[in-house]
Amino acid sequence: MWENKFQKEGLTFDDVLLVPAKSEVLPRDVSVKTKLTETLQLNIPIISAGMDTVTEAKMAIAIAREGGLGIIHKNMSVEEQAEQVDRVKRSESGVITNPFFLTPDRQVFDAEHLMGKYRISGVPIVDEDQKLVGILTNRDLRFIEDYSTLIDDVMTKENLVTAPVGTTLKEAEEILQKHKIEKLPLVDESGTLKGLITIKDIEKVIEFPNSAKDSQGRLIVGAAVGVSADTDVRVAALVEAGVDVIVIDTAHGHSKGVLEKVKAIREQYPDLTIIAGNVATAEATRDLIEAGANVVKVGIGPGSICTTRIVAGIGVPQITAVYDCANEARKHGVPIIADGGIKYSGDIVKALAAGGHAVMLGSLLAGVSESPGEREIFQGRQFKVYRGMGSLGAMEKGSKDRYFQENNQKLVPEGIEGRIPYKGPLHDTIHQLVGGIRAGMGYCGTKTIDELRENTQFIRITGAGLRESHPHDVQITKEAPNYTL
């Protein structure tokens, strides 16, 4: 150990470039799909970080519609996090198999509350045997002033249009158009409510053809958990809400508590997709895989708001960390996620080529309108608040267990709080990032991300090479949408 105290040199994104290769591939022809598990496939290799200024339900919905995956952060109560997951799963669906419903003896107030909370325009009404007896929509409530009125007095009861279980979206669309309605309840032979198809869901399928969805046609979503006292309860609530993947998210994934928690969750939920991290070595990757992780998340200290490497003196430069972990993970057929340090779309290409199956982004997404960070004005420009989960504010709110700390009065932060420029809708940012990925794959002559990972080579560059890579000897007069200094 002592003789090998100083290991190899560590490299990060600015230390390397990919070598261009002979190519018969155009950027528009490449596939940016990536497979994390048999049941979890992304249409773009981008995951939004489980940070309290990056991902809540609004972001998770938006990025899933783009083809990626959002991880709901854990700085909230168990009930609130489960509700956020439920909101994503209910945001759109080919067929809603467990629609909300009310009974005729409930009040209009209850319907208004339910419809407002989940932003839905109507709700089926069933009797005590779950048989459909009516439907209540915004039109029925438009002129109601007394919210204590019973639903039975205002709902539509006559000439209900329904369809049998098994009706396809195409068939449902024809029925909806024919009868000029927006909601189509699905019932069995006895009239029991079994599902719901809405015109909005059909429109969303057309509007967002690249959406990442589960086997039931619902958007996919993940959620972060730690190794705190409420982890078991939190995981149970998230699974009940329909979460697609659990991220066991800690600053040091190669610790006894994390390994034991991964093993315990795997034993409790054999079919649950588990992403575990963060790690930066091959040994840590192997131990997490053996404990039961389906996917390993790599990155200790590379994030723009992370100070772990400065405060604790710990870390491995990200390109080296990704490569080392991927070298081990490929022996087990397990994918890895490169988490942190990515500033440009070119860094995503490098992370994937170094061994990543997907990347997790924080700062590149925190400035979009769908992120939960507060918007503020500074020196005449719009910004959004962005902070590390190791910052004082985030740790005081609930993420201190991620850094294995307990005392709120004596926290030692490993992150900072700041602001980043406001970027507008997520779609515009994703368009630029995916466009950069496609361009990089075209230069390398690789049609798929698997080929990018297997058939590319890096070249190390000097400081002069890095300066040459950026715009130089010119004053930028118009900011590009995908490049800032």
From Swiss-Prot:
EC numbers for this chain: 1.1.1.205
Disulfide bonds: none
Gene: guaB
Ligand binding (IMP): S304, D339, G340, G341, G362, S363, Y386, R387, G388, M389, G390, E414
Activity control mechanisms: Mycophenolic acid (MPA) is a non-competitive inhibitor that prevents formation of the closed enzyme conformation by binding to the same site as the amobile flap. In contrast, mizoribine monophosphate (MZP) is a competitive inhibitor that induces the closed conformation. MPA is a potent inhibitor of mammalian IMPDHs but a poor inhibitor of the bacterial enzymes. MZP is a more potent inhibitor of bacterial IMPDH.
Active-site annotation: C306 (thioimidate intermediate), R402 (proton acceptor)
Binding residue positions for NAD(+): D249, G299, I300, G301
NCBIfam families, sorted: IMP_dehydrog (TIGR01302)
Reported cofactor(s): K(+)
First-level EC class: oxidoreductase
Organism: Halalkalibacterium halodurans (strain ATCC BAA-125 / DSM 18197 / FERM 7344 / JCM 9153 / C-125) (Bacillus halodurans)
Name of the protein this chain belongs to: Inosine-5'-monophosphate dehydrogenase
Family of this protein: Belongs to the IMPDH/GMPR family.
UniProt cross-references to HAMAP family, sorted A to Z: IMPDH
Repeat as UniProt keyword: yes
A Pfam cross-reference name: IMPDH
